[in-house]
Amino acid sequence: MEFKIMSKVDNIEQKVIKVIADNQGKKIEEISVDSRFAEDLGVDSLSTVEIMMEIEKEFGVDVPDEEATKIKKVADVVNYIKEHKS
């Protein structure tokens, strides 16, 4: 059972990284869960909004604006999805 849980988490990480890579025109290998949007990836606020809209659509979660402003790293997105995806 633990393996399935880890696979699900890894899958979430991979999908989030793919969404960001596609949005930013980057290679998947350039992005990790520790990557910071602004500092490491050069993502501006408009692109962050676009990424979060894609994340909402991809995972079927709603990310309110007040929560979205707290998201600074890829790991923040992954953790939010894990906490709010049913």
UniProtKB/Swiss-Prot annotation:
Family, similarity comment: Belongs to the acyl carrier protein (ACP) family.
Domain Carrier: 7-85
Protein name (database record): Acyl carrier protein
PTM per Swiss-Prot/TrEMBL: 4'-phosphopantetheine is transferred from CoA to a specific serine of apo-ACP by AcpS. This modification is essential for activity because fatty acids are bound in thioester linkage to the sulfhydryl of the prosthetic group.
Species, as recorded: Rickettsia bellii (strain RML369-C)
Localization: Cytoplasm
Cellular component annotations (GO), alphabetically ordered: cytoplasm
Main location (coarse class): cytoplasm
